Amino acid sequence: MAKFDVYDLDKKKVGEIELADAVFAGEVNEHLFYEVVKAKLASDRSGTHAVKNRSLVSGGGKKPWKQKHTGRARQGSTRASQWVGGGKAMGPKPRDYSYDVPKKVRKAALRSALALRSQEQKLVIVQEWKPAEPKTSAAAKVLAKLGARKALVVDAAANAALARSVRNLDGSDFLAAEGLNVYDILKHDALVLTAETAKMLEASLS
């Protein structure tokens, strides 16, 4: 078990928490980052690219000139791809770029990402963070005290006030624990977890 300090919002130590080595202090596998992030970015692609082929371009139903005895190359339609205004040959079509990554791989990559932030000393665990109202300036001061600018803040459940406070900061964002993913961890410079969130992640990733 690995021990981590738990802080209040003024960066004063208020206790310690023990978390599984396998989740927060394991081996970092960068290839898993590559696989999971590539899949995430692929699934984000809209895939709506499209062009008109000769069957979709209007007109061109009539043969432009007779087949023989004109001295010109034979043509069947003015909408063939070699004509100006014709359809595109073998152009892009709408497609779905997303593909599945095995659940075990996703979990292993998430464990690696947590271990990486822990090794870099960019993982901060706070006792709790439940603002009464959304206030960006207050969130900015807390992150500055925690030494976690451009941070991803994760709470055990949806926290509307905290989400609105943090998301308005340049380079920072908020996620509920169930939405935590490798891409967002790597995208931000630091990771801030509540103690409850850390225990939830330990249970789900062990």
Swiss-Prot record:
GO biological processes: translation
Residue spans of biased composition, Basic residues class: 63-72
Statement: the UniProt record of this protein carries the keyword Cell division: no
Keywords: Ribonucleoprotein, Ribosomal protein, RNA-binding, rRNA-binding
Residue ranges of the region described as Disordered: 48-98
NCBIfam families from the UniProt entry: rplD_bact (TIGR03953)
Matching PANTHER family: 50S RIBOSOMAL PROTEIN L4, LARGE RIBOSOMAL SUBUNIT PROTEIN UL4M
Protein name, as recorded: Large ribosomal subunit protein uL4
